[in-house]
Amino acid sequence: MQKLGLSGLRGLEGFRSLAGSTSTAAKAPNPKPSSDIGGSTYGSFANLKITAEKLVKEQASVKTDLEMTHTKLRRATEQINLLEAKLQQAVNENAKLKVKQTEDSKLWQGLDSKVSSTKTLCNQLTETLQQLASQTERAEEDKKFFEEILGKNSKAFEEFNCLLHDSSIKLECAEQMIISGKQEMLRIKQEKEEMDQSYKEQLYASDTTIREKNSLIKQLEDSIEQNKARLLYVDSRLECMEQELKLKEDVCICLKENLASTESEKNDLKLRNEGYTLEVQKLSKDNKELNELLSGFTVKVTELDKEHTSISSHVTQLISSFERYDGKVHEEKMLMIKSAKDKFEHLQNQYVNLISENNALQTEIEELKSRIIELQKTQEIVMVQHVEECQVAEDKIRRLESEAEISASNISQLEKVASDLEGRVQKLLEDSRSAENHKQELLQKILKLESDNQELLGRVQSVLNEKSNDTESLQGEIAKRDQQVETLENQVNQLCSIIDEKEQLHTCAVEREKNLEEQKLQVQASLAATESQLTEAKKQYDIMLEGKKIELSKHLKELSLKNDQAINEIRRKYELEKVEIINIEKEKAEKLIKEMENKCNEKISENRQDSERYLMCLKEEHGSMVARIQQDNEHKESTLRAYHKEELQRIQSQAENELRERLSSLRKDHEIQMKSLTKKHEENCQKLQDELELQKSKEEKQRALLQLQWKVMGETQQVDQEVNSKKEYSVSSIKRRDPYIRKEHQLQLVSPETKRKDVNLSGIIQSPITNMLRKVEKGTQDIPKHRKVTHHEYEVETANGRITKRRKTKSTVMFGEPNTQKSLHDTADKDPTKMKKVVAGSHPHPANIGELFSEGSLNPYAEDPYAFG
């Protein structure tokens, strides 16, 4: 419609110029007489011919200008729409990224709270395990006490044997006194029976204690079975995690397939762009053909001029020819308009298809992003110690935002150059490359997440291996305890046999037996108290575990509900914004179409009225104009032809120069932009490489530090002292030495290969059993060794040293052996290979891993606060 309006205006302006020339010619005086009518008609016909040629040329130029302007306007509108869509997409993506950042921050806060709660639980568990260990130590001390009492009884039996020997000698000397002592023997028999009953009661009490200990052993076995059940549960959980990982791998494969489909669609778009360029070339060829047609029409007009030499006979033919010419011009215009409309509709359909394809691609990209978010959420539950990687991801998101801002600035610059086709095609190619780069980055992130999952699986498997080793060690300890119980039973049987043999000499031991009974009652009371404490501790532990499990399940449910609500709200908002934007654009388009239609109709009506007026004027003034045009026609033909040729050559040269200048300027601008973009991309790549190198160096440093720490821990040697005889040590020294703790200590001396394997898991997962064993080791190292002293002197350990004191008692006293620790230090220091690894100023035997890590350069918390959870 705009083409029709502009071409009509140009045609009307040409008719007005003709009318003005005719009117001026009519007003001018006629110098020739009326007798020379033939010459004047010939000149007027030549003038008409010139004006007709001018009109044809002007119409052709107007058509070309209109077509160029229309194509430029269409391209400009399309580019503006595309740029607006890109800006909206960038704004939406920025909003989504901000929402994601807020959600990630909330999730990290929740995870920190969970980690703190789990740490408190671990501390409580370690405390309870320490209490249980102390109680077991007390029970073992009670066992040793009973063994001491049995030794005293054996000594008493030996004394009784001596007395029996003496009494037998006396009986041989005093056979005469047998008759008088029969009554006394009867009394002795009664006392023996009483003693038998008392000893039977003692045996029954010892049996009850053994049964109680058996029950304790059974309880320990039940706890081991519970641990096995927990291990089975952990195995099932691991299988579930493996299934989830397989599902995630399938999702990654689907994502790769979607990426391949998007690349194929990009190739299709490139092919379509090439088709559009071919169509533009075809349009240029059509324009050339139209120009040739116009030249043919000019030839036909010249032929008509030759044929119409006489005015009187051929004026009607001229009028009819003009009318035919106008009809043909109108028909050509209508055909051009129809073809342009068809092409415009075809282009609109293609544009709609492209928009739909872009929307489909956007939906697919959003689905991919949502899947990636779900994968990140599932892995964030397991990945608590990967905070640095998340920080790097946030930095990358910020860089992407900065790149989006830079792209927005580039878009504002590109809007100025949106009038040319070449710039637009190159920008589309750059956008496609950037999209491919983004997809490659997403693929790299997915690969990183998969590698992290594999690392976590390896860590969990190592933890399971450690737990299985712990269970095996506990089973070995239980078997050893069973052996100890059997040895005790054998000793009891031996004592019973000794008691049966020496029933006659138990009259003197009644007082001692009473003391023993009192001690047994005290021991039984202490055992009952310990059992009650154990049951209470177990109940408290079970209650704590159940409460924590309920709290964790509630917290997880709340988090899932919040995430679902936030996702639904974002989707609703996005859909509402889409609908609003579509409605607004539709309303704008309808308004523009209506306005254009109204304007075109108004212009058409005005043009029709003007054309009718001018036709009337032309018919009235035609008779007067013909004579004057024929007179001036012959003189002006030669001059006009020369003038037109020069103008055409000049215009062509100017147009070619302008096109060359524009093309050169556009190429230069394009090259400058490409260079700037390549420089920016290279700088970004270098920054990313530098950051990766820094991270790698940090990780290598941490690994080296951990290896040094574990090597230092492995080099602490432990001296095992062998027991040669019971005479070298007193009963109090046996109390202090704990074989059970020594065995636990030996079980923890693991090979260096297992230590290397456990390096990665030392700070991640610390089981309560390992903490308990380490604390027991610490206790055994702190206990000083003793030796037997039979003198009346004894020493007291103070802060400043030892002080010797004298007392008149004859009890055995223990001296600590200060040289044992020194010997340990000396043996550790003599090794030259170990001297290099120990840091100057540090203790050679650190009591705990925390003390080791708090030393100078071996502290990993100085650079990485999240290295050990």
UniProtKB/Swiss-Prot annotation:
Tissue distribution of the protein: Highly expressed in panicles.
UniProt keyword list: Chromosome, Coiled coil, Meiosis, Nucleus
Keyword Nucleus: yes
Mutant lacking the gene: phenotype: Decreased pollen fertility due to abnormal synaptic behaviors and increased crossover formation during prophase I.
Subcellular location, record wording: Nucleus; Chromosome
One Gene Ontology CC term in the entry: transverse filament
Coiled-coil features, chain-numbered ranges: 64-298, 330-614, 641-713
Superkingdom of origin: Eukaryota
Main location: nucleus
Chain segments carrying region Disordered: 841-869
One GO term (biological process): reciprocal meiotic recombination
Keyword Mitochondrion assigned: no
PANTHER family associated with the record: SYNAPTONEMAL COMPLEX PROTEIN 1-RELATED, SYNAPTONEMAL COMPLEX PROTEIN-RELATED
Free-text function comment from the UniProt entry: Required for chromosome synapsis and regulates crossover frequency during meiosis. Acts as a transverse filament protein and constitutes the central element of the synaptonemal complex.
Protein name per its UniProtKB record: Synaptonemal complex protein ZEP1
